[in-house]
Amino acid sequence: MRDLNIRWLGKLPYSEAYDLQLGLHRSVSQEDSKDDYLLLLEHNNVITSGRSSKENNLLVSKDQLHELGIEYFETDRGGDITYHGDGQLIGYPIIRLSDPKKVIPFVRNLENVIIDSLRKFKIDSFTKEDDTGVWTPKGKIASVGIKVSKWTTYHGFSLNIFDSLDGYQLINPCGNQSEQITSIHEFNPNISFEAVSYTHLTLPTNREV
């Protein structure tokens, strides 16, 4: 039986969170390890591109991003380009899979954890068979992109809570020009960041995420 250790890290720059993931990944991927981790945090404004990212999905230059105070990182996760920033809950599960072929079920479980969380706030959401993430009738509300190495996952998901989504105007989110992006606050502006974070602190222990 493996133990899931859930850590709330507050606001953390992307580079620091990435280094922390790599350190935990080295530990979790050891055959005698019994501990998995779920890191919950918030990032400073940053745009990240995944292994499937195309250059034209970044709609401004990197110099313009710098002028706007937005960092840019090329990453080794799956997926295309996305934005992280204020009011967005980030979850990084560093978990050793029982079978490295179970990547797709792992991603589906992550999506279901988010759907369960949104349901607690009376927000209906759903997945798409040919895509990853979570959608609502108003648009996409959460993104998922992971990497598996040595049977162990890292990277993870982002869930939009506040409606400060200006950064998405600088990209084609996940490579989709027509993608509509929404947030929890577009359904109920009274839901706090802390309330959503607490929900994720408790839900994953009941699932194989």
Give residue ranges: language-model regions.
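Short, conserved beta-strand/beta-arch hydrophobic-aromatic motifs that form part
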Residues: 58-64, 141-165
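Conserved small/polar residues in nucleotide/adenosyl-binding loops
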Residues: 199-205
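A structural signal for short, well-ordered beta-strand segments
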Residues: 91-93, 132, 144-146, 157-161, ...
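A hydrophobic, small-residue-rich beta->alpha segment in the mid-to-C-terminal subdomain
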Residues: 162, 166-198
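N-terminal lobe of the biotin/lipoate ligase/transferase fold
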Residues: 1-141, 190
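Short conserved catalytic/interaction loops centered on acidic-Pro-aromatic/His motifs
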Residues: 123-128, 154-155, 166-171
